[in-house]
């Protein structure tokens, strides 16, 4: 699926993550800012990439500002951002949840 509009989910509070999705052209590209990037960079990207795959998103620019979020928080924020970006917020795809 193509991203229809830029969308964001999350906050910059401690133990949260802010994810912004916008249209991409060359696959999925990441701009990740995190104090724990050295240790969890790959895990954060893998979680978000898996959510994008569930929705069939192949091209996206992903900006992530992580403040120590747990994996389940990252997944929930990614799902919210994707639904908003695809204009599906009013009609969530329950099968991917």
Curated annotation (Swiss-Prot):
- Summary of subunit composition and partner proteins: Oligomer with a subunit composition of (alpha,beta,gamma)6.
For the modification O-(phosphoribosyl dephospho-coenzyme A)serine, the affected residues are 14
Species assigned in the record: Leuconostoc citreum (strain KM20)
> Keywords on this record?
Cytoplasm, Phosphoprotein
What role is this protein assigned? Covalent carrier of the coenzyme of citrate lyase.
Extract the HAMAP family matched here: CitD
Gene Ontology CC, one term: cytoplasm
Q: Which InterPro entries match?
A: CitD (IPR006495), Mal_deCO2ase/Cit_lyase_ACP (IPR023439)
UniProt lists the family membership as follows: Belongs to the CitD family.
Among Pfam families, the record links this protein to: ACP
Report the locations given in the UniProt record. Cytoplasm
In the UniProt record, the signal sequence range is none
Q: Under which name does UniProt file this protein?
A: Citrate lyase acyl carrier protein
| Top-level taxon of the source organism | Bacteria
